[in-house]
Each structure stands twice: as structure tokens, then as C-alpha cells.
């Protein structure tokens, strides 16, 4: 059986926000300072909005750390991860500069991005990094050039596949150099495999859509701060992260073996104060006006929690692309016939067996090449069902003296609120077994 808790690493969504808050506190964030949620921040034509703005064009107004944690206000976390109040344009005046590495160093301290050491096969998860972003963009460019090879390259260059792949590797390596558009054009001409009238177009695509995007940007900081982007952690890691938080940012290790012992912590006084501030903010999530208040109303123990939803990209695949396009081609690309698509797919598989080993990929490429419309992958998949998001809830209880850390992730959970009842039942059962009512 596949052990989902140990092996499936996915985005944590807003459950990562306590890490961002810890990093900001360590740099000098005043948790009582209220910052204005202005709805969204526009960067390079892209909107980075709070969910409230995205859903209803409303904002949370002024929020401090407790309010931002309670309402899961993205805008606030964009601010504190950047050390800037974007609504007013004023610096937050931190004692130390906050960077992406500051946030990631706290994530590492809490056990994210490394194996827990549990007595099972497990994934190490993924911490975002600039090099990881570069690798991802290089792969995307490679996939684009391979898929569109007949559009960009001379026919003669495509015949010798080994030589073609060597030249493709050269293209990708240029991303590691700070080349001007003119320099890229010159290099493409020197290699001599690109269609002459496509050289400038390809050079612009490589530079502006890929090479210039490889360094970390402000947008990456925004995504990093709210648990989106390249974050990927297992449920076990998230439970370990909560346990470390409840232990003053100290990791005690995870094990399947039940054992007794006392909780130990060598955390500094400043770290303990920062952790206490974070747990207080997380307790607001289950308190009056918090998103989980209805679920925990009347619960016998105080609970510090954070919910999160991470979107899984892509679509639920049909049995085969052939059957899918046979059914929907007339709506997706009415200017071509299904028989033309099949014929073109067969040609692609015969001509490029190294690239099109399966019919599904060839069918998709055939539709894109034959249609006169400027179709995208999104257009091709428009009649497929999307995956629902991953639903997360992480928690500590009792909040004033944590004894248990819980992390629940539901695949296709859709909403984080679907994971929270599971957390409630686990904490309640554990508290009952340990007779917390006599202690707290």
C-alpha cells in the first residue's frame, strides 16, 4: 500500500503562514501593528490578491498578526514577507532585512523539506529555491521547443536527433548567462538550425518568457509567503512542523514507536516569545470570529490551528485523448476533422518516435498544429473536470501547553474546512484518553 502521509508531498497553502510570521517576528515585526489589506497588488500585469478580493472584491481592512492569521489574509503576509506596507508604500522598519532565505531557514528549523526519520520510506518534500525555479523554467522551455520543433527549426536539423538534442541543450544553457537579445539572436544564427525568419521571434521568447524570469522576483516572495509555488511537504512533515512549533522550535524527531518521556526545549527566550505569539495568533482561528470557531465552540480544550487549501494543477484525465477529442473536437477546433487529427498524430509518431511514444501526446500535438486557432493546453482540456484542491488543517492542543500536534491533508478535499473536523476528533479523542479534563 502507498503511504500517503509519508510519501505524498504537496503544497501546504496557508498552513505555511505561521512560518512566514515567525521569520518576520525574528526580523522585528510588531505583531500589534495593523496593516491595511488593499485587496491586491499588481506586479507586471499579474494580480496577487487576497482570497476575499478574488472572490468578492472586498478587503479585510486593517489587520494585525492575530487578525491576519484568523482571516488568513494573504495581503498581510505579502507585506510582512517583504518588510513593506504595500498599501502605503512605507517600509515596516524591521531591525534585520527579511529575505526568502530568512523564511526558508525557519522552515528548515521546523523540519520542512527534510525527512522526518520515521521508520518508513518517506519523501523529503521540497523547499522552494531559486535554482529549483531555474530548473523548472528550463524544463518548460525544453518541452515547448520539442513540442513546437517543426515551427521553429529547419527540417534538415530535425533528422539527426542526437545532434538536435545537443543543440537544444545549448539553448537551455544560455539561461545561465546574462545575454542580451542581440547576443541570443547572434548565437541562434551561428548554430544555424533555426528557420531564418523565426530567429528573432525565438530569441525574444527565450529571453523574455524564460531567461529573464529565472531569478527570484517579488511575485515569488508573495507565493512563498502563503505556501504556494514550489513548496511540497508530506503530512508527516507538517505534523513534525507543528510539533516543533509547540516545542519552542525544537525538533524531537518522529517515530512510530510509542514511548514515554518529557517534553524538552532548548529554545532561546526570544524564540519562545516569538513562538508564543504565533500560537496565540493561531488560537484566534478557533476563537471568536475565527474560521473554525463554529467547529470548536464548546470544545473542552483550547486549540491553536491553521487551515489551508492548495490547488492541484491539471485536469482529471479521460480514458484516452482519442476518445476525448472524438467527442469534443467539433467544439474545441471546429476548423479541423477528427480523421485529420488521427492522420497527423500517426505522422508525428512515425517521424519522431523519440518524442511521441504514446498516442495521447501525439493526438494533442496534432490538434494544436492543425487548427488555425491559437489554441492552448487550457483550450484543449476545457471539457475535462479539474482536480479539487488539497484540504489542510494543522493544530496544536491545548494551546497554552501543547501536548499533541495534528496535521490532516485530504486529497481532493476541496476546502480546508473539510479537514478540520478530522483534527477536532483526533484532539478530542487524545484528550479523553489522557484525561486532560483533570489537567487543563
Task: Report each predicted region and the residues it spans.
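Beta-lactam-recognizing serine transpeptidase/beta-lactamase-like catalytic domain environment
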Residues: 1-14, 22-404, 408
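Short, gly/Ser/Thr-rich active-site loops of penicillin-recognizing serine hydrolases
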Residues: 262-266, 424-440
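Amphipathic oligomerization regions
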Residues: 401, 411-430
